[in-house]
């Protein structure tokens, strides 16, 4: 399920009182799974929401487990990290194992990720597209995942996009959910974003945000 289009469907079902009693879980894929979309899907359908990460050319690469950890699919690919920064975030490379007709060797999938090596295994955090990363005023790279974490405890947002203004500051445009967040509820997200970006962030409530030509939505856009 595409998380953004799935969120719109969930809100439609909520307004119409539609229920799916046989539904056991929701698997999201195709684009970045935001905490705001996940919150709405879980609220409306009342089931766990899992993230399946991959691409058309590689197949599935990572699957979220019940603990919220993104685990590697060892049967389909090997994953490597390249050019990691001080936060451990770097370019994700994949070598496919399941496509005999078009194998990919150390393929740059175009995403940023972070590898966490644990005593019981390795998991990953997918940080979003490389081209969608922002730059803070102090020159640091700020990823889509880092931006999205600012909305973890902020209810009332259905969808958003953060992008820089011509003056170097940033503007957060968001679509309200169920009346939308008031200024007090939105303040923690704004404070978190300003701490990340080291500059002021203006906010604007909008009725809609358009997708790219591909049909995907950009939560962050440089």
Where are these regions (language model features)?
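Active-site glycine/GP-rich loop and adjacent strand/helix microenvironment
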Residues: 1-222
């Amino acid at each position: 399920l595409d998380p953004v289009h799935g969120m719109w469907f969930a809100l439609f079902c909520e307004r119409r009182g539609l229920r799916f009693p046989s539904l056991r879980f929701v698997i999201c894929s195709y684009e970045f799974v935001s905490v705001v979309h996940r919150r709405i899907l879980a609220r409306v359908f009342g089931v766990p929401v899992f993230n399946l990460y991959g691409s058309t050319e590689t197949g599935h690469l990572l699957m979220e487990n019940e603990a919220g950890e993104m685990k590697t699919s060892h049967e389909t690919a090997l994953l490597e990290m390249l050019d990691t920064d001080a936060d451990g975030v770097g370019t994700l490379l994949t070598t496919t194992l399941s496509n005999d007709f078009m194998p990919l060797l150390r393929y740059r999938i175009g995403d940023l990720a972070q590898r966490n090596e644990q005593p019981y295994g390795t998991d990953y955090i997918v940080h979003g597209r490389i081209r969608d990363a922002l730059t803070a005023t102090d020159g640091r790279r700020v990823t889509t995942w880092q931006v999205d974490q600012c909305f973890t405890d902020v209810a009332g947002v259905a969808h958003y996009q953060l992008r820089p203004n011509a003056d170097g500051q940033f503007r957060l445009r968001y679509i309200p959910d169920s009346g939308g967040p008031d200024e007090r509820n939105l303040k923690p997200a704004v404070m978190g974003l300003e701490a990340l970006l080291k500059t002021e962030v203006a906010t604007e409530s909008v009725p809609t945000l358009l997708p790219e030509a591909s049909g995907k939505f950009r939560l962050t856009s440089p």
